[in-house]
């Protein structure tokens, strides 16, 4: 028995050695985390309806304590080589708003990454993160964080919490981000960054994505597998509704006496305005607009009733008061759209939500 146990131990040891050898034999490149991050984001592309483009157009950032020698150096050394531009704003909150606005303009198929220093520089991005997440707009946030090894402790602008030593200013990003990760080792990015981009490029999950980067980790060198930097194309999906649900919607439309359409930002992001125009003209259903949905149907179209809700117009709001069926296309049905659910007065009203996000599609008991 002892001999067999010794033989098994030797076999296990040999397997471990072979496993490590296979890892070492893989092609690798030695880069700092800052350099690797720039090269990785440059290779991330999206594709929808056969059209393909780079997802991260460049970086916005204000350099200071925490990101100068890490991501800052990586941007200086690698961004131009990779075809990424760098822009310096006057305020961190502003650069997140700019990135979200750019993503909106590009129908969520492109955005920017934003880098900041530790503490107040990072906290200035929190409001922008909340706006991006609420409005389903992709932005990649890379705030700097205190030293992962905690040898320099405390450091400038560190929150010295008396009971929770792992808390930093960047924890404020957790409730306003669709994805949050604080990395403490370079190799953790091998799993974290692909997941971050999966969420950024998913129309149902997108919003602010935050990867918190300790300043020592940013400057740490690591042997990265070269396959990590190969071009990756993320397919932007167009999920199809179930046939039974379509039949139910058709049945409701046939029975409705005063249906209206509320078109939101999703109609624009999905480039569905030709289908909206064809549908409303075919069936003669009036279209009302949310703030994000403005422009989905030409302003001078005979069936465009204009903005709806608390800050809406008379025509749209009078139609909403009498409507017995609301077809909500790509809208979050916010309080401004529904006037805090007081806009619709017909006791028999029903809602149909058409949205890639189940949470938004099911609002107002749709």
What does each model-found stretch correspond to?
Residues 13-366:
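N-terminal alpha/beta PP-like core and its mobile active-site loop of ThDP/TPP-dependent enzymes
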């Amino acid at each position: 028995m002892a001999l067999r146990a010794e033989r098994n131990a030797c076999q296990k040891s040999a397997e471990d050695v072979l496993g490590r050898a296979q890892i070492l034999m893989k092609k690798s490149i030695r880069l700092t985390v800052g350099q690797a991050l720039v090269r990785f984001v440059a290779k991330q592309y999206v594709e929808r309806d056969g059209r393909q483009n780079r997802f991260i157009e460049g970086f916005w950032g204000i350099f200071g304590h925490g990101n100068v020698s890490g991501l800052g150096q990586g941007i200086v050394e690698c961004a131009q080589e990779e075809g990424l531009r760098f822009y310096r704003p006057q305020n961190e909150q502003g650069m997140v708003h700019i990135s979200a606005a750019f993503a909106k303009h590009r129908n969520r198929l492109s955005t920017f990454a934003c880098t900041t220093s530790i503490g107040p520089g990072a906290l200035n991005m929190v409001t922008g993160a909340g706006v991006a997440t609420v409005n389903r707009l992709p932005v990649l946030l890379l705030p700097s964080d205190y030293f992962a090894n905690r040898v320099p402790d405390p450091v400038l602008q560190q929150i010295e919490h008396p009971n929770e030593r792992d808390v930093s200013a960047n924890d404020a990003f957790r409730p306003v981000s669709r994805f949050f990760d604080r990395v403490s080792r370079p190799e953790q990015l091998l799993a974290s960054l692909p997941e971050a981009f999966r969420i950024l490029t998913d129309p149902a999950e997108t919003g602010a994505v935050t990867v918190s980067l300790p300043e020592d980790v940013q400057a740490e060198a690591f042997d990265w597998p070269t396959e990590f930097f190969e071009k990756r194309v993320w397919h932007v999906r167009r999920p199809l509704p179930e046939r039974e649900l379509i039949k139910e919607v058709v049945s409701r439309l046939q029975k409705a006496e005063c249906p209206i359409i509320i078109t939101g930002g999703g109609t624009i992001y999905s480039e569905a305005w030709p289908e909206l125009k064809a549908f409303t003209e075919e069936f003669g259903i009036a279209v009302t607009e949310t703030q994000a949905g403005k422009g989905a149907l030409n302003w001078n179209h005979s069936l465009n009733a204009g903005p709806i809700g608390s800050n809406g117009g008379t025509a749209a709001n009078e139609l909403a008061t009498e409507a017995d069926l609301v077809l909500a296309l790509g809208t979050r049905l916010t309080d401004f759209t529904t006037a805090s659910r007081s806009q619709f007065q017909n006791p028999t009203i029903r809602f149909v939500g058409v949205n890639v996000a189940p949470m938004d599609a099911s609002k107002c008991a749709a």
